[in-house]
Amino acid sequence: MRSRTPKVLHPLCGRPMIDYVLDAAIAATGTRPLVVYSPATDAVRTHVAERADTALQDVPRGTGDALRAALDALTDDVVEVLVLSGDVPLVQADLLAALLEARALDHAAISLISVDALDPTGLGRVVRTEGGTVERIVEDKDASDDERQITEINAGLYAIDGAWLRRRIGSLRPSAATGELYLTDLVALAREDGRLVAGLDVDDDGRLTGINDRTQLARAEWDMRVELNDRWMRAGVTMQDPSTVYLEHSVQLAEDVTLEPNVILRGRTVAGRGTRIGAGSRIIDTVIGEDCTVIASVLESSTVEDQVTIGPFSHLRPGAHVGRRSEVGNYAEIKNSRLGEHVRQHHMSYLGDAELGDDTNVGAGTITANYDGVRKHKTVIGKGVFLGVDTMLRAPVTLGDGSKTGAGAVVTRDVPAGKLALGMPARIREIRKPDDAPAPEAAPAADGADGADGADGPA
């Protein structure tokens, strides 16, 4: 893999590949798995700790030695051992159940899964007797020319009689070529003991291919994604171009959700009935309600209630909560803020550490200046507030219900309910009603003097 990350922790559709193997093992056996790790892969032990027991293989000396380490960690009452590879994430529980059943029916010492491979190059061949029973497994480098013509290969999945395995694991001998102990040599030992080795031959559908490099990882993820997308479409989700839709297994989608091309949904994202996710959207750990529209936007760890429109080019950062029927438009950013119902933030503004009441309008260019260089401060905006374009709200600050700000206002102190804030810094004024008489025009101020209304900057 050419990576500092242990191979089995590389992700497929949002989960480390070993998680899928553990899922299959638990579903097939109903027991807690045991994972063998080495000192170089201690991250594997940490990752699986909640779901599996672990055993340390001090010095990696091959698959047979790994199985020995596992046996040392198992109790004596274990009567059957199912051996899986952590790098075969597409393995299915029903296949493992069939493997266990095959051993039980034949009273075999070992049952194994083999595959008729289209290209067996580099893989261990399954050699059978004239009667069709498994005689031995020969590695590619040790195979004769005739044996290399065999297309039946060992898939590396085994069910083994526990009592027999304990007696014979010590009989494994190091390979002359590598010095390693091969698990596959157990097949020959079983035949020496006159025990049957059952082979379960399956078609090569790609599910049992081990992952050893990034190319194989990408192919496995593609196969998994095709299956996942097909499952959601059969459940009532529309995908206009499934080949460009990327979903992780933890995502939940309701009926009549529509996903346009080039959509990425990750983590614990949820989309409610009738919601449409537009092309180019990237959504992570976000709950979206019903009948929403998201257009070419990024949403992270946020909550979006019903009938909300987001985008294009909006960014909801962690902690954003957008109320029903609200509208968040182009180049609008929200972080750790709660918007009430029917809030309009249509263009080019930033709301951080803020709380907005229902029916508030956020003018273009509005910014909550929430950071003083040391701490974040909160902005509270009431119901029915109208924020003029280019309003700067220096937190901490509160704007009461029904208040307004003029264009370019820099609000540095609280604005009472129903009042108007004008200027830089803003001064508080009464809101003039449409039927009020206009105020007399002020005389122009001298250069360098305050405006005619006594406020700094433009009057």
Model-assigned labels for residue ranges:
Residues 294-459:
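Glycine-rich hexapeptide-repeat left-handed beta-helix
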Residues 245-247, 251-320:
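Acidic, glycine-rich loop-and-beta core segments that form the ion-binding/anion-interacting portion
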Residues 18, 70, 87, 99, ...:
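Residue-level signal for inorganic ion chemistry
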